[in-house]
Each structure stands twice: as structure tokens, then as C-alpha cells.
Amino acid sequence: MNRYSVRATFSGLLAATLALGVLAAGSAEAAAGKQKAPQVQSRSALVMRADTGEVLYQKNAQQTLPIASITKLMTAMVVLDAKQSLDQTIQITKADVDRLRASSSRLAVGTVLTRRQAFTLALMSSENRAASALLRNYPGGKAAGVAAMNRKAKALGMTHSRFVEATGLSGDNRSTPSDLARMVRAASRYPHIRNFSTMRELTVKVGRYPTLYRNTNPLVRNAAWDIDITKTGYLSEAGRCLVMQTTITGKPVVMVLMNSSGTLTRVGDAGRIRRWLETSAPAQLSASR
């Protein structure tokens, strides 16, 4: 083999090596790209920076779905807007009993609560009778309260949302992840909602006995999470839902998770999203806008 052949062979090998390197790098980048998005199991979801409104992740975010007890955040806002005394007492009556799904409640008819206690039980423990009593005692009654809920939704730009009652027991209370993110951002501006929704537990007297209620979102009891506001929900047709605003790497983030199938799926999704934001997508949170 002459020296020209040796040079040609060497050049060919070098070119082949470089080409393989480029292909390998491209494959690595493609693989990394596939890992950029979190593996969210909920059927619909949205992640948004609460301070800027920037959407960081979405999955079927414009799909209109039943929202179950997420409804109670809107109920809380309109009742608080009415500026009724939180120390005034209200009573659970037969009108607050669930006739639609016959769901159970530990709040017996005749139980007397302060409005503050009713708010806490409705938001923290998703107590349907408490939410019903709050709206029933709204100025003008339930019908006026539902009308206020829909006006509030319209004012917030929730163009694909509809409310028909206070608790979320009706599948006709519907919204999208995009609209619910707007609602969570709005609700976070109410100090009482932030406080009531994130309490770990509350003991109230029902009849002659104290009754302990716990938060339906287990993450509020996890010291690793800094949660500003939260609400869970469940209906057979809505699946398991979770909305919350939390702080991740120093930035406020709204998470909306809808139509999860498993009991712990929505909580697992929240953890996956958080890890993704902390590791794979830090630039999206560190950017100042």
C-alpha cells in the first residue's frame, strides 16, 4: 500500500468516526429531549408559573371535564366576596344533605358551625354539607350564589367553565385545566382560602363529641412541600383531581391535575412534575420575567 492509499484510508476512518460521533450525539440529544417532559399519568394537566402566567407544561389543557370538589374554591371566593362575618354561626339543615349521590357526611343535620369552621371543613376536608351551608347562607340564597360563581368565572376569563351548585357533586360543574389555573391564581389572593385549604387538621364538636377532620391532600403534611393553596376532588366521571399552588426553587407554581385514575396517581404526578422542574427544566423557573 503506498502512502497515498494510507492517507486515504486514514481519512476515511476519521470521517467515519466523526460521523458516528455526530450520530451518537444526536441520539443522546433525542433521548434527552424525550425525557424533558414529565411522565404525567393524569389525563389532563397544566403547570403554570403563578407570578407570570407562563405555561410550563400542558396535557389536554383545553379539555372540558367535570371538576368535582375543585368547585369549592369558587364557592369560597364568592362567599368571601360577600364579606359575611366568619364568626357568625350557621346550621347544617336537611337542605344540605346530598340527594344526588347520597354521599355520607359526619356533619349531622342540626350541627352548628361558625362560618370560619365551615370554610375550613369545606376546603381542607372537602365537606359537602359545609360547602352547601355556606352558599345557602349567601345573600339571596343558593341561586344567587351560583349566579355569582358564574359571574366570577366570566370575570376571571374562565370561558369554558360552568357552575350549577356549591359542592361539586354535580357532574355539570365543568371546566378545563387552563381555566382552573386561572381560578387557583385568583383564589391564592384570598388569605383565608390559603389558610383554610392548607390546614393539616381541625377538630370540631359535632353533637356532643369532638370530631377530627384531616386535609384530603397528604402533601400538606409533607415537610418537603411548601403549599400555598390546594384543593382535591373526586367523582366517578371526573376521576381524582388536584389543584394547588406551591413554591418550587423559589418560584410560585400552579399545578392542575385532572381525571387521575389511581388513588395516589395525582400525588405521584405532582412529585414527578416537581422533580422535572427542579432538574430538567430549571431555566424555565429561573428566568426573570
Residues of each region from the PLM?
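Active-site-adjacent loops and short helices of periplasmic peptidoglycan-processing enzymes
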Residues: A30-S178, R182-P191, I248
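Sec/Tat signal peptide C-region and signal peptidase I cleavage site
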Residues: L23-A30
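Bacterial N-terminal signal peptides
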Residues: S11-L23
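Penicillin-recognizing serine hydrolase domain
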Residues: A31-S42, R115-R116, G140-R289
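Bacterial N-terminal signal peptides that target proteins for export
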Residues: N2-L14
